[in-house]
């Protein structure tokens, strides 16, 4: 599953739409992953002490839970914490490709895309949960449809196998419906606003912001009938790390996590939030007023909330349960063939020690 992509075919760019793909964002990294990862891991294992001291290379992209790091970058907080980092800006899918090719120590990804990336050969471990989507992913319907139940017998546009396909499945299940009760129209995420506006027989589309907002603008009277706020924890975002880097640089990764929680506090504090939003919006080419709703649709996780989400459980309030759900979706929709060992992708030790 993948996310913001060039309007989230990968979480590509919120300013110029993008987001999840593995069904949560395959935020594109399937093809080159296995061979490139083998090369990357070999290089990592053979790293000299000088190489080990190099800045941590972290890929980030246009999603509020990743853009939040821009605050720390511009404030110099990583230097204050004594950790040398090199944050590299990508379209979402390109960041996963770079990670799979061994060019990054870590990358910002949805929990579902972490599984997709690993299934493709690029092993990774989620050590920090930055947020969960809380409204930025939507099922947008046009009149006369006003409820999820109203989708029965209708055509619904989604990018099959991506995160908002998962959102649609979740919406249907919560309202005693199933996919066979409607007809899926497969389209690229960035094409969905046009599909909704121009196709008279397409009743709704599933997309993330800002693509969802574009659909709402194009179709008078359209409205979200189900969002990720209705299924908190369905889509987590994380910093997922190459296991070799994690093993050799644990102290540095602990510092990165500590800085993250400083970012969350700064963003959530009403006194400093305007400055934080100014920094974040500038990174993606939006005004603070344009960016604030996107931030509000993202539930950033502080240390206490992350500790709770890192607790093993079967529900969506646990990243374990959420990832099992994503794994089942990925297998069911042939994103990959073999179910993944979810626990192998999650290591809460450093975050829980904060």
At which residue positions do the language-model features occur?
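Short, glycine-/small- and polar/acidic-enriched structural segments
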Residues: 52-193, 199-209, 225-226, 233
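N-terminal secretory signal peptides that target proteins for export/translocation
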Residues: 1-25
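Short, hydrophobic secondary-structure boundary micro-motifs
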Residues: 81, 126-127, 276-277, 308, ...
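Sec/Tat signal peptide C-region and signal peptidase I cleavage site
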Residues: 45-52
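Secondary-structure end/capping motifs
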Residues: 247-335
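Hinge/cleft segment of the Venus flytrap/periplasmic-binding protein
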Residues: 326-328, 332-354
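Bacterial N-terminal signal peptides
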Residues: 21-23, 29-44
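Pocket-lining segment of extracytoplasmic ligand-binding domains
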Residues: 112-113, 190-194, 198-284
């Amino acid at each position: 599953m993948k996310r913001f992509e060039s309007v989230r075919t990968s979480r590509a760019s919120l300013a110029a739409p993008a987001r999840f793909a593995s069904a949560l964002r395959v935020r594109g990294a399937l093809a080159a992953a296995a061979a490139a990862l083998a090369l990357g891991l070999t290089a990592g294992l053979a790293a000299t002490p000088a190489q080990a001291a190099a800045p941590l290379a972290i890929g980030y992209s246009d999603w509020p839970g990743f853009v939040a790091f821009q605050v720390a970058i511009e404030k110099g907080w990583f230097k204050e914490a004594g950790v040398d980092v090199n944050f590299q800006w990508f379209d979402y899918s390109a960041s996963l490709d770079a990670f799979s090719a061994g060019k990054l120590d870590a990358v910002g990804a949805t929990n579902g895309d972490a599984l997709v990336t690993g299934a493709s050969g690029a092993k990774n471990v989620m050590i920090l949960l930055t947020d969960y989507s809380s409204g930025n992913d939507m099922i947008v319907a046009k009149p006369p449809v006003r409820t999820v139940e109203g989708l029965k017998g209708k055509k619904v546009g989604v990018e099959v196998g991506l995160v908002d396909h998962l959102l649609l499945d979740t919406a249907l299940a919560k309202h005693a419906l199933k996919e066979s009760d409607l007809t899926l129209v497969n389209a690229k995420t960035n094409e969905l606003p046009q599909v909704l506006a121009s196709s008279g027989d397409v009743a709704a589309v599933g997309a993330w912001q800002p693509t969802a907002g574009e659909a709402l603008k194009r179709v008078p009277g359209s409205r979200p009938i189900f969002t990720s706020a209705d299924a908190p924890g369905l889509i987590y975002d994380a910093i997922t790390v190459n296991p070799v880097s994690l093993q050799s640089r644990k102290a540095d990764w602990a510092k990165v996590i500590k800085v993250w929680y400083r970012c969350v506090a700064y963003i959530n504090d009403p006194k400093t939030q305007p400055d934080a939003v100014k920094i974040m919006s500038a990174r993606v080419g939006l005004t603070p007023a344009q960016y604030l709703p996107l931030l509000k649709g993202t539930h950033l996780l502080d240390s206490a909330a992350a500790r709770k989400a890192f607790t093993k459980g079967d529900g969506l309030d646990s990243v374990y349960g959420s990832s099992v759900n994503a794994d089942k979706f990925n297998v069911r929709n042939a994103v990959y063939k073999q179910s993944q060992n979810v626990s192998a992708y999650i290591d809460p030790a450093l975050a829980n020690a904060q």
